[in-house]
Each structure stands twice: as structure tokens, then as C-alpha cells.
Amino acid sequence: MEFDAVLLLSFGGPEGPDQVRPFLENVTRGRGVPPERLDAVAEHYMHFGGVSPINGINRALVTELRAEVGLPVYFGNRNWEPYVEDTVMAMRDNGVKRAAVFATSAWSGYSGCTQYVEDIARARRAAGPDAPELVKLRSYFDHPLFVEMFADAIAAAATTVPKDARLVFTAHSIPVAADRRCGPGLYSRQVAYAASLVAAAAGYDDYDLAWQSRSGPPQVPWLEPDVADHLETLRAGGVKAVIVCPIGFVADHIEVVWDLDSELRAQAQGAGIALARAATPNADRRFARLARGLIEELRSGGEPARVGGPDPVFGCLAGINGEPCRPPHCAARETAAQGA
């Protein structure tokens, strides 16, 4: 399978104070999120001048991708400019026939995969009958370079805290019902498996996994423990230093720079705990090499590059033109569950 372009598909983020509220309304449309919750989240962005770091990071990643893949690289978002619909129309107008889609999520499940599949289908509908073929690359939470980048980030963070620092992985929490939607704990099992691979690569036999950035009504069960609650448990157990690795994020979303770097760090300081936060991949050249490797797998038909571990959890295969993932992966399970 050959490609004549690459599309970097991401979440999007505001780039000025006047964009914050419209962006949040895009993100939460149809979910019944109360206005006061949007106001609270908007304040997080205002601490950074109303600018999310994600678009700047993605533009830097586009530069790295262009150098690695030797193809035109386009950039489109779900929730803010440049919108993926506009990007795909530009690709059509530029004569692109088939593009590899690299999404900034390593995971399966609705938020991690299916929503990006829906983005692809929606963008192709907007572009009409001459829309390019769009091939979403597979999940990559067990790719050797994904594991290497996070293991190296942990090693760098470890140099800034005492040697007995406790390693804590975090990922975005989701409702328990959502985690069961695509099979038994598909997303949470993938995160736990990736954490085990990264911990082993970084030389840690013992570590913790916690969840962050939950929202919604308190009566709705979400994945636990929450990282703030877990930090208190560690404090009560006498832990004096932690390394937090946000393995669920491939870039510095607001959930990383606010929820961890601001709120969790303040909690740690108040508890007398030294906290080091491991870097996310962001625009690391190896992240672009990872994408190139996923493209080469489709070009050559070769075996996927994966780090093996006990009790492996597999992710989504490549998907074409917004079609559901093939069994036994997430969108196929979702479709089957909805039709039952």
C-alpha cells in the first residue's frame, strides 16, 4: 500500500483567550456539561494566556514528520482550527489520492480510536466524491519507540529526585461503563500493559498506575484510583518522592501542564513530597520515526513492531476511510454491542 501524503490528526486546542470558550463548547457539545464546569476548565487555560500547548507541539511534529517520511504532511484537528474537514478538502484540492492518518492517541476505545475514525468519515463526507482515501494507522502503545521514549523520560526525571522515588503512571480516566463498551476494560488493560513495558524498560519492578482528569457527576463510576487520592495514600505510607509518568498522553495537553504540573505538584509540595514529571513525546524525532514505521508496515506488509510482554493486549489495526475497526478491536465491538 503506497501513500502520497500523511495527515496528522489531533484533538485541537485554543490559541488565545477569545478561543477558549468556543473550543470547550466544541469539545463538550451534546454532553450536557453545565456552563459552570466550562467556566472552571476555561480558567485552567487562562493560566497559560488562553493558549493550549498542543497546536504548537503538533506543528513542530509536522516538521519532524516531513523530514522522516519524505511526503507532504497535513495537520487537522477535531475541535479547533485547523479543522480536519478543511484540511481534507485542501488535500483533495492538492490532488492527494491516499494518505496515512497518524492520530495523536496510542489507544483503542471510543475516545482513543473510534472518535478519530468518525473524524475521518466526517471529513471525507465534507470533501465529497473526490476525497482522498484515508488510512488510519494502527494503535501504537506497545511500539518499541513509544516504550523507549517514555522509559528515557523516566530516567531523566529520576535524576532530579531521590533514588527511592515511587514511579506512578497516569492516564486520562474514563467512565467505567465506557471502558467496558469495547470489550472488558480494553483501554485500561492497554494502559496497564504499556505501563508494564515502560517500567521494565526503565528498570522498575514495582510501580503504580493511577488515573487523572476525571469529570462528570460524582455518582458515575470512573477508573480509579485518582492520582490525587493516590498521592495522599503514598504520603500516608511515608513516601517522600514520586516520579509521575503521564503515559496516557503523547503530548502536553492542558491535563498535563495544569492537572499534573500545577495542581498535583502543589499537592505534593504541601505534603512534603518531591515530584518529578516525566516528559511526554511531544515533537521528539523518535515519535516521527514511529509514524514512519507504522507507514512502512503497511507498505511492506511486514509484521508490526511490538515490544513483547506477559499477557499482551492488542490494539486496533489500520482502518480505511472511517470504516469500523476489524474484530476483535474497538469499533467492531462497539457496533456489535449496539446492534445486540
From Swiss-Prot:
It comes from the Bacteria. Pfam families: Ferrochelatase. Gene3D superfamilies: 3.40.50.1400. InterPro entries: Ferrochelatase, Ferrochelatase_AS, Ferrochelatase_C, Ferrochelatase_N. One of its GO terms (cellular component) is cytoplasm. GO terms for biological process: heme biosynthetic process. Pathway: Porphyrin-containing compound metabolism; protoheme biosynthesis. GO terms for molecular function: ferrochelatase activity; metal ion binding. The keyword Metal-binding applies. The keyword Metal-binding applies. Fe(2+) binds at H172, E255. CDD domains: Ferrochelatase_C, Ferrochelatase_N. It is an enzyme of class 4 (lyase). It is found in: Cytoplasm. Its main location: cytoplasm. Fe-coproporphyrin III binds at S52, Y116. Its EC number is 4.99.1.9. Keywords: Cytoplasm, Heme biosynthesis, Iron, Lyase, Metal-binding, Porphyrin biosynthesis. It catalyses: Fe-coproporphyrin III + 2 H(+) = coproporphyrin III + Fe(2+). Involved in coproporphyrin-dependent heme b biosynthesis. Catalyzes the insertion of ferrous iron into coproporphyrin III to form Fe-coproporphyrin III. Belongs to the ferrochelatase family. This is Coproporphyrin III ferrochelatase. The gene is cpfC.
